[in-house]
Amino acid sequence: MRIVMKTELSLYVDGNKIICEQHGDIKNAKKIVLFCHGFPGSSRLVRLCDNLKNSSISLVEINYRGDKKSEGKFSFLGSIKDIKTVANYLKVKYKVPLHALGYSMGGLYVSNIINKEPHIFKKVILLNPVVDSMALFSNKPLMDELWKHAKNILSLKTPEM
């Protein structure tokens, strides 16, 4: 039985130390997957490391500014910059194909990045990505719409009534 190695990688972005967790033998990897999780706290929702035990793929999980051991304050634009910085570092240092796995909000970050820099990743996987960012970031709270529907359901009224 092969044990998946786990080490930490740290980089500085805008003076803040960003901590990434490396899973697998990154020095001998034939591919690297950069795992971009969603909001801070959602990084443990997807467990991929055990699936890498017998592969030549290394997984690097980024912890954005303000998440876990990473310094700084969390922000959406900061998270995008963190991903781009880590991606460029991995491409230059290891010179193997770099893929992205964007989960939830991380999927929105990765989508934003590849829209402007389509060649930064060889392949991209979006797992349950946030796709309606206009509704998410609009001035009108999403909760108003949800409460409207909830009241109709709770009062057993159809929307036409």
Predicted regions and their residues:
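Catalytic nucleophile-loop/oxyanion-hole region of alpha/beta-hydrolase
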Residues: 40, 67-94
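The alpha/beta-hydrolase serine catalytic core
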Residues: 18, 120-161
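N-terminal cap/lid segment of alpha/beta-hydrolase-fold proteins
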Residues: 1-25
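The serine-hydrolase catalytic nucleophile loop
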Residues: 38-51
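Short beta-strand element of the alpha/beta-hydrolase
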Residues: 30-38
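Short beta-strand immediately N-terminal to the catalytic nucleophile in serine-hydrolase-like folds
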Residues: 100-102, 127
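Conserved alpha/beta-hydrolase
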Residues: 53-69
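Gly/Ala-rich beta-loop-alpha elbow adjacent to hydrolase catalytic centers
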Residues: 102-110
